[in-house]
Each structure stands twice: as structure tokens, then as C-alpha cells.
Amino acid sequence: TEKIYLMAAREPLALPRCSRAFSLLWNALPKVNTRGNTTAIDIKVKSKLKDKLYLYAVQVAIKEIITEIRVLKFKALVYFLNIISMKINKQTKKILLLSILYFCSLPNNLFSQDSELFANDLNLKAQLTFDFKELYKNTNDSTFIKSPMVFSGNGIDQDTITVRVRVRGNFRKKICYFKPMRLEIRKKQAENTVFENNRKLKLVVPCQNEKGKDELIYKEMLAYKFYENLSNIHLKTQPISLKIVELKNGKEIEHEMFAFLIEDDNKVAKRHDIKKFPKRRVSPLNVGDSSAINFALFSYMIGNTDWSMAYQHNTEMFYNGKKLLAIPYDFDHSGLVDAYYAKPNPMLKISSVTERVYRGLCRRDPQVFAGMRKFYISKEEDIFNTLNEFKDKLDEKEFSRVNSYIESFFSILKSDSEFKLNILSKCRG
């Protein structure tokens, strides 16, 4: 008699690739004891030599699966069908089947590359090499140039893949020396790297090649991190120490900078089981009240007026089957960032981008508005904790300005009179 102790994931979402097999077999398994976040299954098996050989064969196959994880789905199906047809001890068969189901869960738990890219403390470093003139002369949405990308990080050995690069954006594309970029990585290039399952990425870089160029990018990334505290549906970011090797007149000019990656909006849709809404004009009233108020309050907090839900300007729009959901992005024209090139919209009649204007609609549920106000107040400590994580990245004077800027927002939020004067009475429509 041998005792086999097997750990299987409890969460049903951990086994989407094998869910059909899992549902067929779960009822046939022995009773289980729940321990923490896993289910422990103890099975005593009287195994004949033949059964042990089958068990050994499957163990060898499992090792092969781990080594070559790309073929997991196909091989798991083959092993599953083979085991069903085996004439062996029923308990042994259960163990073998459960083993296959367990390892079917590995790509989602142990080998989830798309989550690895946006993991914390990755300390990602990368180098791109290209001719700026070649990149900048091809500015339409379908024209890319190729560049080698050398990268490394915590737990990531140095590797090189080929990426496709193009310029993106509007305002920064016109005025900046380093322009915002979009990266595309072919599936075969990304396989078995931290970039696996991340075919499209945005790359945010400093505007000009000058002293202190990184500070604006740190503040823009801070805005994304603020929003992570305020909405579970958000764009993930990953800081990156970037070196761009500029090819110019037969020379190589190196530029080192802080930058960050932004995940593709399709990843957000997949993660939350929602659909990306087409880029077309929409009625802001079709955006759910909670999402719209959150968007508008967040924009007010960071002093951002450079957005439009109707035209989906700096707005990613999704559909959950009932209402539209809006996610903000591109914050370089906000008062939080206070970029030297940022100019306020003359239609808003403000003298500086640091001057806040609430641009949300009036036709929203008052109870939802009141609830969102309380929610923001409850998140004050989280917001300042996030801000303090960037303290050593900003000049002392600039950090103090940003800190005071966010403090002033919460002062307005916590005062009934100030809230009514600056937000409720300023809503549109």
C-alpha cells in the first residue's frame, strides 16, 4: 500500500483549459479535506506492478510537459484519453487523471507569463536600437520598423528578441524628441519569455533629451498607480530602465531613461470578461454611473482635463453587457504631472493645467455620487502610501508640491461646502 498526497487548485478559474474533464471527474473523486487555498486529497492505493509502470509513465510525461509547456493542451488531452482506456485499478486511474488535471492548471498558476510581465519588483531593463529618422518618417498606424530588444530583470536571464516599433500618440508625437511608442511582439519571439502573451504594448518615454527628463514620467506613472487604488478595472503598468541606441550617420548614440510599459486594452477586457468597445463617438450617458463618476473624480483629483468620453479621447471604453465602462489614460497634460509643454484648453477658461475643473455630467444617480465620494475618502491613506513610494524619484520641492496638490483634493472632498462649490455645482448638462 502506498499513500499519495496531491495538491490541486480549488479555484475553478485556475483550470479553464481542462474544465470539461474536471467537471466529469470531480464527483468521482474521494472526499477531500480543505486546507487554506488548496484542497488536499489523500488516496491509499493497492498498486500492482502494472499500475506502478503506468504511474511512472505518466510522471515522465508530466516532466516533459513542464519542460515543454507550449504543448500542454495537446499532450494533456492525449494522456487523458489514454488513461480512460487503461484497464487498471480504479483508484490508480483516479490518481493519474487527477495528476493530469493538476498539471493542466500549471500554465494559469505557475507559468502565467502575461501576469509575470506586470509583476512587482521585476526590475526590468531593456535596450532598443533603431534609426530615429526611419521610425519618425513612418507615422501611420500600420507601419512598423524592427528593432532588437535586449532585456533582463529579477529572475530573468538576459535575452534578445525582435520587436516591431511605431510611433503613437498625438501631441507628444509632434513636439517630442523621444516619442511615445507602440511595441508589437510576434508570438514566436515572445514564447518562453516574460513577454509571452503580451503581443501589443505601449511604451511611455520622456519627451526631450534633457536633465530631469525622467521626473515627468515618474509622475505620469504615479497617476496610473493612483487609479489602481480606485478601480479594479485599470491598465497595468511596468517600470523599465530603458536604453535607446540611436543610429545616426553611422554612429551609435546611447540614451538612458526611465520609461514604463502599459498593457494592451484587450488584456483588460480578457481579464475582466468584458468587451472592448469600438473607437467611435458615444453618448457619455451610456457609461455606467459608477464608472463615469469614478473617471471624473479621478480626473479632478489629478487635475486632468485632457479627455473626452464622447470622442473616446484618452479614454478606453469597454462594455460589460449592460453599460459602458470608461478607463482613463495619458496623463501628461494633468496638473499632477505639470509638464512644461502642457497648455490648458482655452474653452475651459483656466490659466494653468494645475487649476482643477470638474467635467463630469450632472445627470448621474445622487446616491452613487455620494457613495463614490465616501469611497474616495476611504482611499486617502492608500493614495498617500502610493505617493510616498515615489518620494525618492522626485525632487524634494516637486514632491512637496504634488503632496500638497493631492491634499487639497481631499480637503475639498471632505468639506460639504467645498464639495458643493467645486464639484457638484460645476457638473455639466
Where do the PLM segments sit?
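Ser/Thr-rich, low-complexity intrinsically disordered segments
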Residues: 1-11, 31-46, 58-70
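Short hydrophobic targeting helices and cationic amphipathic motifs
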Residues: 6, 19, 23, 55, ...
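Short polybasic linear motifs
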Residues: 11-17
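Cationic, low-complexity basic patches in intrinsically disordered or flexible, solvent-exposed regions
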Residues: 12, 49, 53, 74
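Bacterial Sec-dependent N-terminal signal peptides
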Residues: 77-113
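Phosphate/dinucleotide-binding and metal-coordinating scaffold of catalytic cores
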Residues: 113-429
